[in-house]
Regions:
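Short, cysteine/histidine-rich loop/knuckle motifs that typically chelate Zn2+
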Residues: 77-80, 123-124, 181, 188, ...
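Iron-sulfur (Fe-S) cluster-binding segments and ferredoxin-like electron-carrier domains
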Residues: 83-88, 129-134, 191-201, 570-580, ...
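Conserved alpha-helical substructure of the radical SAM core
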Residues: 122, 127-129, 133, 143-270
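Histidine-centered metal-binding segments
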Residues: 627-647
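N-terminal [4Fe-4S]-dependent radical SAM core
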Residues: 45-175
Length: 647
């Protein structure tokens, strides 16, 4: 037995040598391809069945104005509220939002002392200023890597909201609020849940029409649908909505949830999975109960752990959704990533969302806003300073950068495809992303950019798509690109080239000829190496509103009045308040009288947890949770990976 480790070491060295040889051959072959490619005319674009126009070559794509100084269209925070009040009271007609430009003004984006600022002046309400980035070099990098807009959206009844209309692409995540009721009283809250004085809740007929209408629009791209609220699990139609969305073909059915029902009702997750729920977007503000105290439940972290366990046991993937407020929980960026690494088999994604001062926080004072403002550049620097993971100027990309791979996949699917590939085509100021390779067994990790030159691979994908050499040769060139951009000399121990190829094949829906394993949660759990995505999604508020971002929104809100950009719905001119008020079911008092009150947990006390629940299998590095004090089976301490996160 003593010789086996030596045999394994020799085998691993042999694999590494073979990988180095392969990558060198691929690099040489790629340059041959590029040299020949210059002398052969590009293949022509085709119009797929799912689109209203031919696929775009990279040079045909349009771009918003980027860089600085630049001028854009924005809103006056005070004018907007005045106009919204008049529309809600009947003093102004709703057509003003469609035909006019209420509250709009010009804004300048410029550099000041290494920061990027937005400045605007209203003739009536004066000067407004807010920070867009604390690092102008990082801001410049993210804008430089933007690959261009998607196909033009067709303006029709679902997208007829004046200057708030989405004008490019199809979106990635269709968001549907099932109810504005909630069982918490969070601050911040996009919709000011439980405080508006009325209940807005969709009927099943509403849900069917909204979901049916959404898949008739061209470009007809694959979309996820996310049921939201309020708390969507309070809707009596939650399971029906999930099942219907799955039935008619939505790529991925998700729920944005606080996790309370998944915690208190162990069978709730199983029923949701049976209905077709694939992903839970779980509100998660940090590690330990003290980092959730602003949510007004004293043991909320314990609640989250139980929800994650129940969701995992039911086969539902978990995305941690972290609203970051400067001076409140910005110190939790590192601990949240560490928690996700230690539980990478249960957590597939972290979505950090810098605070948007809207809903319950729309009237924030200037001093508090300045203190609590958090940007995407804050996030990139906090990830490095708190964990040692990633370099801001190397490892972060605009979310839209992956559009190069979506374009390639669209080409490989051919003209007969009924659906286009899901595409994240948002403005570069909207979102950023990075990714880690994490071993499920050892918890060893590495930035994906350490293993593969992602920036160069995206450029290769653009060249392959523009060249249009047919599906067979394009797949050959994709394989060459992956090989030439892979660096076997710096991969974490145990990671091999075959792992990378399988991961790429799954993430692109079988672009290399394999099975679409990304649709199967069980398939992901069988992998030894997992990709943990870390994203920053910064939703706008009235202080930093930019209509160029609204036009390219990838998260359309599907409502009884059509599909509206996420930011135009939740902030902007205030479409949420208008839609909900015009389509409300009843006043809150009338609803309570007829249907009774749903519980609201908001008194800063413990939420009683089920006593007969199975032991938790999550690993937690903190003593600030009930399980650590009661001897429950969660593990505490370091992850023993040498990652440096526990110093």
């Amino acid at each position: 037995m003593e010789g086996f480790p030596q045999v394994d070491a020799i085998k691993l060295r042999g694999i590494r040598i073979a990988e180095i040889i392969l990558t060198n051959i691929a690099a040489a072959a790629w340059w041959v391809f590029k040299a020949i490619n210059r002398f052969i005319p590009e293949g022509t674009s085709f119009q797929p069945a799912w689109a209203a126009a031919p696929l775009l070559k990279s040079r045909q794509k349009s771009f918003p104005k980027l860089g600085w100084p630049r001028e854009t269209d924005s809103l006056c925070p005070k004018c907007v509220k005045e106009i919204r009040t008049k529309i809600l009271s009947g003093q102004e007609d709703l057509r003003l939002l469609i035909d006019g430009h209420p509250g709009e003004l010009k804004a300048t984006i410029r550099e000041q002392d290494g920061k990027i600022m937005m400045e605007k002046t209203c003739p009536k309400h004066g000067f407004f200023s807010d920070v867009m980035a604390i690092d102008s070099a990082f801001f410049s990098r993210i804008e430089r890597l933007f690959p261009g807009r998607d196909l033009k959206a067709i303006t029709e009844k679902l997208h007829n909201h004046g200057t708030s209309s989405i004008q490019y692409g199809r979106g990635s995540v269709l968001t549907v609020d099932l109810t504005n009721r909630c069982n918490m009283m969070c601050d911040p809250c996009f919709m000011d849940a439980n405080q508006v004085g009325y209940v807005h809740e969709l009927s099943f007929e509403d849900i069917q029409k909204i979901l049916d209408d959404a898949i008739t629009i061209k470009p007809r791209r694959q979309m996820s649908v996310q049921f939201s609220g309020g708390e969507p699990t309070l809707s009596p139609l939650f399971f029906d909505a999930v099942a219907y969305a799955k039935k008619i073909g939505y790529y991925c059915v998700q729920a944005a949830t606080n996790g309370i029902r998944f915690t208190l009702e162990p069978d709730f997750a199983k029923k949701a999975r049976e209905a077709g729920l694939r992903v839970a977007y779980l509100q998660f503000d940090g590690v330990g109960n003290k980092n959730h105290m602003h949510r007004k439940i004293s043991n909320l972290f314990d609640v989250k752990l139980r929800a994650i366990q129940n969701l995992y046991d039911a086969g539902i993937d978990v995305v941690l959704v972290v609203t970051i407020v400067n001076t409140i929980n910005n110190h939790q960026v590192g601990p949240v990533i560490q928690f996700a690494i230690e539980n990478a088999d249960k957590i597939s994604f972290i979505s950090f969302q810098p605070v948007s001062f809207t809903g319950r926080d729309e009237d924030i004072d200037d001093e508090t806003r300045s203190r609590q403002r958090y940007t995407l550049s804050h996030l990139a620097h906090d990830v490095k300073s708190q964990t040692g993971i990633t370099e801001p100027m190397r490892d972060w990309f605009p979310l839209s950068a992956v559009g190069a791979v979506s374009d390639l996949t669209d080409y490989l699917k051919g003209p007969a495809a009924d659906w286009g590939t899901m595409k994240c085509g948002c403005h570069p100021n909207c979102g950023i992303g990075s990714a880690l390779l994490v071993s499920k067994k050892t918890k060893k990790w590495a930035p994906l950019t350490q293993v593969i030159n992602i920036e160069r691979f995206f450029e290769d994908a653009r060249i392959i798509t523009d060249s249009a050499r047919g599906p067979f040769w394009s797949k050959v060139f994709v394989a060459l690109s992956l090989l030439r951009n892979y660096d076997p000399t710096v991969t974490p121990e145990g990671f091999q080239l075959t792992h990378l190829l399988k991961k790429f094949d799954k993430q692109t829906g079988g672009a290399l000829g394999g099975r679409l394993g990304a649709l199967d949660n069980g398939n992901r759990k069988q992998d030894e190496w997992l990709i943990l995505f870390i994203a920053g999604m910064w939703f706008q508020d009235l202080f930093n509103y930019d209509f160029r971002r609204t036009e390219m929104c990838i998260i359309p809100y599907a409502t009884q009045m059509g599909e509206i950009s996420f930011c135009a719905y939740n902030t902007g001119v205030g479409w949420r308040q208008i839609v909900e008020k015009m389509h409300m079911n009843a006043t809150t008092a009338e609803w309570f009288k007829e249907k009774g009150r749903n519980p609201i947990y908001a008194n800063k006390k413990d939420l009683p947890l089920p006593e007969d629940a199975a032991p938790l299998t999550l690993k937690v590095t903190t003593d600030d949770w009930t399980g650590a004090k009661t001897g429950a089976s969660c593990q505490s301490g370091g992850c023993d990976s040498g990652c440096g996160c526990h110093n």
